[in-house]
């Protein structure tokens, strides 16, 4: 069974093809480095380490958050964390107004005291409004591809979002994928953008 199918079977995650190719390389590098058979638990740990912030990592196969399972083997997880978000319509109803509270650990993660930031933006939907909001403090990101799906059925269903972002100015931009998981499809989308931004800064 391929890696994509194993993630879909065990964790209800249906990765887009280009994300699948990217993650396959991460798993292959792990296999080449460790010289060991890659088990299902290794795949999930690698996926969490690479794409999911601490608060998203403690999930069952059904996508239910069961607590923080982040451990010392996982890398410190990036600059930004989404604390709260609210979305409303503009005065004429044509635009989306988004307000968010973020925890900003600074560009040099670990070297600065985290700061809570209130940001707001306007766009033709929550994603565009969020990109507008974070651009106000120096984060330049644009969407190249986006996919989403529910992970289960019922009132407690979780949603998964996958986004391919260009992060940074044109001459120094990186193309990276991000993943977000949440009970709200809007919040999962915003978490996927943060995942991509954090990954871009971890890779520098």
Regions from the PLM with identified roles:
Residues 4-204:
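Terminal or standalone catalytic/regulatory effector modules within metabolic enzymes
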């Amino acid at each position: 069974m391929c890696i994509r199918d194993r993630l879909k079977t065990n964790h209800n995650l249906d990765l887009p093809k280009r994300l699948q190719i990217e993650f396959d390389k991460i798993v292959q590098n792990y296999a080449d480095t460790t010289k060991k058979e890659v088990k299902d638990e290794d795949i999930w740990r690698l996926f969490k380490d690479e794409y999911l912030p601490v608060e998203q990592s403690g999930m069952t196969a059904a996508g239910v958050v069961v607590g923080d399972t982040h451990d010392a083997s996982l890398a410190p997880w990036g600059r930004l964390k989404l604390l709260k978000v609210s979305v409303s319509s503009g005065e004429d109803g044509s635009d989306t107004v988004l307000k968010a509270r973020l925890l900003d650990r600074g560009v040099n993660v670990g070297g600065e005291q985290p700061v809570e930031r209130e940001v707001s933006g306007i766009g033709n939907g929550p994603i565009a409004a969020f990109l507008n909001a974070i651009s106000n403090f120096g984060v330049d990101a644009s969407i190249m591809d986006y996919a989403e799906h529910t992970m289960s059925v019922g009132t407690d269903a979780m949603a998964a979002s996958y986004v391919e972002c260009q992060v940074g100015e044109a001459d120094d931009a990186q193309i990276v994928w991000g993943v977000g998981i949440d009970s709200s499809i809007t919040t999962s989308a915003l978490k996927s953008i943060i995942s991509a931004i954090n990954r871009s800064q971890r890779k520098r």
